[in-house]
Amino acid sequence: MSSTKLSTSILPDLVEIQRASFCWFLEEGLAEEIKSFSPITDYTGNLELHFFGDQFKLKCPKYNLLESKRRDATYSVQVYVPARLINRDTGIIKEQEVFIGDLPLMTDRGTFIINGAERVIVNQIVRSPGIYYKSETDRQGRRTYSGSLISNRGAWVKFETDRNDLVWVRIDKTRKIPAHVFLKAMGLSDSDIYNGLRHPEYLKKSFRVEGNYTTEEALIQMYTKLRPGEPATVNGGQQILYSRFFDPKRYDLGKVGRYKINKKLALSIPENIKVLTPQDTLSAIDYLINLKFNIGETDDIDHLGNRRVRSVGELLQNQVRVGLNRLERIIRERMTICDSESLAPNTLVNPKPIIAAIREFFGSSQLSQFMDQTNPLAELTHKRRISALGPGGLNRDRAGFAVRDIHPSHYGRICPIETPEGPNAGLIGVLATHARINSYGFIETPFYQVINGKVVSDGNPVYLTADQEDNFRIAPGDIAIDENNAINNDIVPVRYRQEFTITKPEQIDYIQVSPIQVISIATSLIPFLEHDDANRALMGSNMQRQAVPLLYPESPLIGTGIEAQAARDSGMVVVSYQDGRVTYVSANKICITDDEGKEVVYYLQKYQRSNQDTCINQRPSVWLGEKVVAGQVIADGAATEGGELALGQNILIAYLPWEGYNYEDAFLISERLVYNDVYTSVHIEKYEIEARQTKLGSEEITRELPNIGEYSLRKLDDNGIIVIGSWVEVGDILVGKVTPKGESDQPPEGKLLRAIFGEKARDVRDTSLRVPNGGRGRVLDVRIFTREKGDELPTGANIVIRVYVAQTRKIQVGDKMAGRHGNKGIISRILPRQDMPYLPDGTPVDLVLNPLGVPSRMNVGQIFECLLGLAAENLDKRFKIIPFDEMNGAEASRVLVNEKLMEARTLTEKDWIFDLRHPGKTQLFDGRTGEAFDNPVTVGISYMLKLVHLVDDKIHARSTGPYSLVTQQPLGGKAQHGGQRLGEMEVWALEAFGASYTLQELLTVKSDDMQGRNETLNAIVKGKPIPRPGTPESFKVLMRELQSLGLDIGAYKIENLPDGQTRGIEVDLMSNLHNRRVPSRPTYESITREDLENSFA
């Protein structure tokens, strides 16, 4: 037996981190914040406004979830707080419920709906408030120590020793103050100081050098140091000390800071005292001095015991505090300005500051992110993400290697594999599978206790934080355990004090609950993970999140056992709340009646568009009359099958070079994958158009479009809007719209007609919504929003129309595919089935990969998966292989694969499945010639994903298009309909070949020589020779920039003189600046009769 038998049963709810934090905010955080700033008094002390934070009320949301998404609204509740205004002069008390703002509500899936889009608040990992000590050694080898006291809010205090053995205090990086002066200013006597130190003689040196002070002198001395140039008084010193350290509104250690300081300095100050006390300061200085005598230890800033996670609830609480502080100022001003008789709580409280603070947080904070909804795994991982960036966090440009690196304390808490590639590597992580966050914000992970070499696994596991764990010897989760729960080996590898060592089973304190405890959900979905290089496992984890949900999902033949929980917790599947029997089932809803006859209706999501334009569609997986139990999956969602995650397809693959078509990781696929819709996915695009009020009149949605034939309007209804169900091609009209034409838009003949016929002939311009490139498909839905219906529209818009077009995308050349082991590639060719290599039984292979992609990348897990998949297909079984299976014996993976292949060979009587001469390889035949390949080939069934990087979204072409205003060069990128940039490397290539004329026209008339490009177009239209290029606009910009720096720069033309000498004549490149036309579109000069006759001659 192995410890993994118990592992999956205690996997926590994977989205609990989001939900629990938001619940805490509603139950405690919000009330705590409102109470903290009550009462508010005016400057005279006459008026007092009290808030009863714990009695706040939430009103029902204006729209439900679906309606909020449909209307682009925010799914939020209104917050009302009872308030009492007391007038001390008159004794009048007024009580009212006041509205303090809208609070977005979390959905049951842990997301928020802001302006109709689902968003996620990412958890932030920051330095925990507390005290941290570090040592530094100077060039002479002398060691100095310093301790930083970090608060949640307020001044930072630094205690430091110097080379002369003096102790100093620094407040907020200002000038140094002698430590004893600071202690005296805080009200401690000499005897208090000496009694509180283990080595008082060390501080006596500071007394001798800096002099002894009374409390009053110390306050004056401190004031002088902190506010030099101002007259120092005792009162001023007390004031500055109070405002910096003893005022709860300005200085706050927080619950966590108090806990950490008490723990580090062995104090027992109550948790509700969140300001600095003299005892804290004295103990901090005592600890600093003790370090000089090698007592105590310095801190590691990257240890997870010193970093804490701020989840949604706390981040929201901070925003509410910001809003309340702004509100407090407004209330004070109103109390002063307004007549005290007419004042009431309602008139004093303006909800705008709080609404603005919350809206700003959800709309533009770095931690509020547009949810990645590509597939259920992407959604789940996004909610479990931990970021070190954001307000109060790190800056990616200044973060060094130490912060990004894997720390031993991450073990079982933050996944060492799953992190982005690129500038954010190491700054953004994901919670490990079993990790949870405790009330202080520290990450905990579970362990079973080990007593005398026996694992106690029948009770609940013990959750430990990183600093608690350091004191125990902890065994990994993949060591062998016998049936009596005793550890088998004589010597066991353990972790102790952040080191990996070995020890005897009797000395072990705890054991991990599961081998996958160390890694994240996405990483734990990779079978045979232990045989893959970490870099490739990272790519595999990240690419599973980019897999597109397919039309016909198929769960993997080789899984790890986590698939079902990942699908369930992502919220994509529908789960039954109660035991009962299915009384009605259709594509849209399922009804389940329990034993007491109570019916519950479950509505399914049909063809909804996700944030990434993929399709969310739920399908019932139960039959009429079927008995279901609570917690059973009754409907599958996108990318799930049978309640399990199904991101890709099991297909037959071969590792074999084929005519160079799988060079550099390219894939060669069979047309079966296209014709049988194996990798077909549905994508839903949203197109929007608004009719606005312009200066020349309002735009109109209409079918009457100028110069458009009836054929182009055949799919529109009477109002000029596309009919639902129509098939549309690129360039088709979705919504007809006309805009009044301005005077400047009129051609000369138009102006003449207007002069003759007056206003009536005033023209309109066709500005209809058309299907863009790559947008062909079926119209799924049309939504019309108007003010009359009560919809909120953008300013200036009279009507907004949204058209949803669904398209099926078959797999094609240029699409990106990948396996779960980081083996990614682009499809280079689609071969007919008959040309694909085939197996001895005639089955053609579906996909051909390059065998050179395996050895150098060291992701051998794909080979194990591929061969076990072949066995699984032939045995008609599915395997769940938990990673790190070496506890079952040496080379367990290899033994298992060989065993199962042999079993499959015996069962099917196909000898080629397992050839003893070359195990794991099979004789393969060339589909074109029917001849066998020279060498046997590795063939098997692997789980391959189609990724969201589809060629349809990337392919792009441009003939003419928009230009940048400043440089007059074509814009870049598909979104701007840009051109292909000819960069400096491309210029070098043309220079190397000496293609001077090609290079010249690329840098001038094809780019930013404005006059030249217009003249060239004219010449091409008239069939004349192309004129010589002029000066590029970007050269003129460069000259202007250099001139703006005060450099006298000019362009000179070289002229040959009659005597054979040359001279330079300055040319004014800007001479035609004022009379040039704005080149928004190419200009044609009209062709004269003479030109026409010449061209026909």
From Swiss-Prot:
It holds the Pfam family RNA_pol_Rpb2_6. One of its GO terms (biological process) is DNA-templated transcription. Its EC number is 2.7.7.6. GO terms for molecular function: DNA binding; DNA-directed RNA polymerase activity; ribonucleoside binding. It is found in: Plastid, Chloroplast. Its main location: plastid. InterPro entries: DNA-dir_RNA_pol_bsu_ext_1_sf, DNA-dir_RNA_pol_bsu_external_1, DNA-dir_RNA_pol_su2, DNA-dir_RNAP_su2_dom, DNA-dir_RNAP_su2_hyb_sf, RNA_pol_bsu_bac, RNA_pol_bsu_CS, RNA_pol_bsu_protrusion. It catalyses: RNA(n) + a ribonucleoside 5'-triphosphate = RNA(n+1) + diphosphate. The keyword NADP does not apply. It comes from the Eukaryota. Belongs to the RNA polymerase beta chain family. NCBIfam families: PRK00405.1, rpoB. DNA-dependent RNA polymerase catalyzes the transcription of DNA into RNA using the four ribonucleoside triphosphates as substrates. In plastids the minimal PEP RNA polymerase catalytic core is composed of four subunits: alpha, beta, beta', and beta''. When a (nuclear-encoded) sigma factor is associated with the core the holoenzyme is formed, which can initiate transcription. This is DNA-directed RNA polymerase subunit beta.
